[in-house]
């Protein structure tokens, strides 16, 4: 089982898809990594040679922010928005959508399940 950036890649998936299991690497990044490493994107993870794995690992270490570093940067930027009290930061703090979506109805995923308010009936 190939282990890259602290993540065990799934054995039976193509390497192009397997690399997307690493936080911070999507499909486009995965394709560009494989192109630079000159590894066929249709090879299964279990069929990779040690040389291929080391090439991929080296490219990811040099050029990409992945896993813990990427998560830390994301949380720090959200924390910074909340500290400077900008609109996006306040929306993060209140658990509401950030990008102008309506909240009178919908937005259930972001706001959580319904909370019944006592004494609120239509007159």
From Swiss-Prot:
Residues 101-123 have a biased composition (Basic residues). Part of the 30S ribosomal subunit. It is found in: Plastid, Chloroplast. This is Small ribosomal subunit protein uS13c. Residues 92-123 are annotated as: Disordered. It comes from Rhodomonas salina. GO terms for biological process: translation. Signal peptide: none annotated.
């Amino acid at each position: 089982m190939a282990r890259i950036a602290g993540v065990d890649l799934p054995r039976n998936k193509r390497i192009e898809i397997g690399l997307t299991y690493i936080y911070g690497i999507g499909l486009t990044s995965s394709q560009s990594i494989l192109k630079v490493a000159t590894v066929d994107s249709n090879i299964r993870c279990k069929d990779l040679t040690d040389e291929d794995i080391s090439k991929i690992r080296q490219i990811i270490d040099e050029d990409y922010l992945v896993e813990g570093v990427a998560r830390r940067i994301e949380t720090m930027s959200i924390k910074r928005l909340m500290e400077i009290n900008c609109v996006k930061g306040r929306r993060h703090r209140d658990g509401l959508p950030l990008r102008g979506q309506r909240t009178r109805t919908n937005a259930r995923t972001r706001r959580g399940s319904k909370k019944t308010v006592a004494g609120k009936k239509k007159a």
